[in-house]
Design a protein with these regions (language model features):
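The feature marks proteins involved in alpha-glucan
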Residues: 1-40, 72-155, 160-167, 174, ...
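Structural beta-strand segments of beta-rich domains
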Residues: 41-45
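Conserved, mostly hydrophobic/aromatic
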Residues: 47, 94, 156, 183, ...
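Short proline/glycine-enriched turn/loop motifs at strand-loop junctions of beta-rich domains
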Residues: 48-55, 575-578
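C-terminal beta-strand-rich structural cap/linker in extracellular carbohydrate-active enzymes
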Residues: 88-92, 599-635
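Substrate-binding/active-site clefts of carbohydrate-active enzymes
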Residues: 115, 135-148, 157-338, 617
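Conserved alpha/beta catalytic core and glycan-binding cleft of carbohydrate-active enzymes
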Residues: 305-307, 322-488, 495, 516-587, ...
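Intrinsically disordered, polybasic Lys/Arg-rich low-complexity tracts
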Residues: 633-696
Length: 696
């Protein structure tokens, strides 16, 4: 193939901005781009390799001969070449001559497409030719209040959610066809995909990225992934991607020692490597690396229309001593352990994205108490608009794993989150990290026998949905997947043939739909205006009760019994006189419960918990119940008590009548462990098996 070098000089502005760390669309300049020069169609290639002695483009088109297509150094560290005749899907790499005169073959850091592992070459691709149909979705999102709207996220791994009969994963477009009806039926607002940026090792789940501008070819082409997003948006479902700017792998064809020396990684060995992960840390203080990473983040939002990025491993970026022993790290210039360059990068990245697209989401997976994560960079914050609440997750899973006999002594784990619940814009995450590496699935974390496990999990889900903050649940946990997640296998969908699993799925579906329809559960998530304790301190009986409010003051009463004991005539103060109607009860028979219900309960005049009124309810064992709250009755010259958003000082929970086991004839008398009569399967005449073989 005849070689034609580009005579055109690089545009001054993108190059200048790139070297300043401010080219946030560097992918438009670097990489491979189909174009025509001097009447000849082909592609222009550009790469940043500041230490290289020479660079050439190699591929099938020149039999991978390094001397066939040498590139021209056109600027400080930037190499360029136009090659006529190049077409879409052509495979290529850069052959780089290092300062030590060694040849290294590297994939294009800015490639839009790549070969499927174990092959690792880059592919030429034109992403601009896709015909989008989601303008209505995009316009609607610009008008939505992302902070004060409902958000229930379904986290999934694209390759193992569901597979074809032959065990092959669906491609992106096929996956969308399977996923859309399920997500709509289940009531989720968003899906969050584990990383789909190209990666070499299946076992990393995508968290060791080799291609920051290429959706993994495991599941199809870039256009296939665009179609995935387009189909979900058409169905009213948002798409969030996991994005990994914290570190990258050492694979020889990737970013590691890209041109024979530290290029993308920090050159200081005490800052530039995560030894426990076997990965390299980006040099966040290098302007060209800043341009690369911010461009990647904006690329997925602007070119693939995704609705947000969940930024992985933020804590590892913030602290120089993260997972490092004494002597393995160095202080910053101020004598502290904070990574000042990483902080500045995160602030720049978030400001760039949310400045352009304020309706999008930047979500931090940050596991420490770092302050102001979701406050603007201009105010000293990191600039995210959401943060995973890892403290809540750890406390609640620890509490739920505890035998109910010992929960009284751990009651603070249920209530402690409210000391900081409104300090950040939190997402409550029950993610993939909690159901792998011997941690057990969520259902298997629950104590007790088969029935009790499901009752515990329903109680937890009801509490989680009512707790302030947006929601996230990993795939399979909505129907009680018993075994841990394995990225090589699809979920155990056959479990839905068993009553308890189908009933749990029905409960999660009803919770999601109720949540979306009930503004008090999401409209004021990040202020005491939207929450008020009624019973925070009944640790002896493991009961809590609280109110949620929407922006207009409409309330929902939530009561949780974390003990497997029936509580009859349980009294609690309520804000308004009138009838309190039971709306959702996790112990409902249709959810697999024992059927203890309240129906409607009328308030009784008499002070309790700072209110003038109180009610008496029956609390099923291991249950969460939602009650409607009647509107306040206006009294001339005398405002109703307890209508302020400030939480009234709670009194000790009133002792209910002596706990007792109900008479056998009453439906409410069934203990938790008692199995209800077998039900007929939904679409079959034979009775569903009651108990599948489970992993202990």
């Amino acid at each position: 193939m005849k070689q034609t070098q580009s005579a055109a000089k690089p545009s001054d502005l993108p190059v200048y901005l790139f070297h300043q760390g401010n080219n946030f669309e560097a992918y438009r300049y670097f990489g491979s781009h189909l174009e025509e020069q001097d009447g000849q169609p082909g592609a222009v290639f550009r790469v940043w390799a500041p230490h290289a002695k020479a660079v050439s483009v190699v591929g099938d088109f020149n039999s991978w001969v390094p001397t066939s297509h040498p590139m021209e150094k056109v600027s400080d560290g930037i190499w360029e070449l136009f090659i006529p005749g190049i077409k879409i899907y052509d495979v290529y790499k850069y052959c780089i001559t290092t300062p030590a005169d060694e040849l290294v073959y590297k994939a294009d850091p800015y490639a839009f497409h790549a070969e499927t592992r174990p092959s690792n070459g880059s592919k030429v691709f034109d992403i601009s030719s896709f015909d989008w149909h989601d303008a209505a979705w995009e316009d609607a999102q610009k008008k939505n209040d992302v902070i004060n709207g409902p958000m229930s996220i379904y986290e999934l791994h694209a390759g193992s959610w569901k597979m074809k009969e032959d065990g092959v994963p669906y491609n992106y477009s096929e996956l969308a066809d399977q996923l859309v009806p399920y997500i709509k039926d289940m009531g989720y607002t968003h899906v969050e995909l584990l990383p789909i940026t190209e990666y070499p090792f299946d076992g990393s789940w995508g968290y060791q990225v080799s291609g920051y501008f290429a959706p993994t070819s495991r599941y199809g082409t870039p256009h296939d992934f665009m179609e995935f997003v387009d189909k979900l948006h058409a169905a009213g479902i948002g798409v969030i991607l996991d994005w990994v700017p914290a570190h990258f792998p050492k694979d020889a064809y990737g970013l590691y020692m890209f041109d024979g020396g530290p290029c993308y990684e920090d050159p200081n060995p005490r800052r530039g490597e995560h030894k426990e992960w076997g990965t390299m840390v980006f040099n966040f203080g290098m302007p060209e690396v800043e341009s690369f990473l911010v461009s990647s983040a904006l690329f997925w939002i602007e070119q693939y229309h995704v609705d947000g990025l969940r930024v992985d491993a933020v804590a590892s970026m913030l602290y120089l001593d993260y997972n490092r022993r004494d002597g393995e790290w160095e202080q910053n210039v101020k004598g502290g352990k904070e990574n000042l360059e990483a902080i500045a990068f995160l602030q720049k990245c978030n400001t760039a994205i949310l400045g352009r697209h304020p309706h999008k989401m930047m979500i931090a997976e940050e596991s420490t108490a770092w302050p102001l994560v979701t406050k603007p960079a201009a105010d000293g914050g990191l600039g995210f608009n959401f943060k995973w609440n890892m403290g809540w997750m750890n406390d609640m899973l620890s509490y739920m794993k505890t035998d109910p006999l010992f929960r009284a002594g751990n009651h603070n784990k249920v209530t402690f989150s409210f000391f900081y619940a409104f300090s950040e814009n939190f997402v409550l995450p029950i993610s993939h990290d909690e159901v792998v590496h011997g941690k057990c699935s969520l259902i298997n974390k629950m104590p007790g026998d088969y029935e009790a496990k499901f009752a515990n999990l329903r109680t937890f889900y009801g509490y989680m949905m009512a707790h302030p903050g947006k929601k996230l649940l990993f795939m399979g946990q909505e129907f009680g997947q018993f075994i841990e997640w394995d990225e090589k296998k699809q979920l155990d969908w056959m479990l839905l043939g068993y009553d308890k699993h189908h009933e749990l799925q029905t409960y999660v579906k009803d919770l999601n739909h109720f949540y979306r329809e009930t503004a008090s559960l999401w409209q004021v998530d990040y202020s005491w205006e939207g929450f008020q304790w009624i019973v925070p301190d009944d640790n002896k009986q493991s009961v809590i009760a609280f109110l949620r409010r929407d922006a207009k003051g409409k309330m929902l009463l939530v009561v949780c019994n974390f003990n497997p004991v029936l509580r009859e005539s349980y009294s609690m103060g309520v804000p308004n006189p009138g009838t309190y109607k039971e709306l959702i009860n996790s112990d409902d028979v249709k959810y697999g419960g024992t059927g203890v219900k309240n129906g409607s309960v009328k308030s009784v005049k008499g002070p309790m918990h700072g209110f003038d009124q109180h009610i008496e309810v029956t609390l099923p064992p291991l249950s969460t119940i939602y009650f409607s709250v009647p509107a306040a009755r206006k009294k001339a010259g005398k405002p109703a008590k307890a209508e302020t958003a400030e939480a009234a000082k709670p009194e000790k929970a009133a002792k209910p009548a002596a706990t007792k086991t109900a008479a056998p004839k009453k439906r409410t008398a069934k203990p938790v462990a008692t199995k209800p009569a077998a039900k007929k399967p939904r679409a079959a005449k034979t009775t569903k098996p009651k108990t599948p073989v489970t992993e202990s």
